């Protein structure tokens, strides 16, 4: 089932590299507009939010649409790793607010080591 939005976390990725990838994968990006600590743009018709250093060295990328080229976070994370060559983390499936805290700490890491399930405490 297609997720209503896509969110991945990228380690040490530059905003410009992400912009270039989004332009290629989704569509031309409008100029980034900074609002507080976040940056927003449109990639094609998709609203995008970039939060630098959302969790330590990890940047958050949110595509706020179900009309992305990817079915879910994992598919997007795989494409991002292939294009950018930096470690990517994402939730293993759609995340629900009412999930147990232990489940909320389960993540998928995609890197040069391959794909693995990890425990990542983000608080």
Residue ranges of model-derived segments:
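Short, extreme N-terminal segment that most often corresponds to the first beta-strand
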Residues: 1-23
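Short amphipathic alpha-helices in soluble, non-transmembrane regions
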Residues: 18-27, 75-79
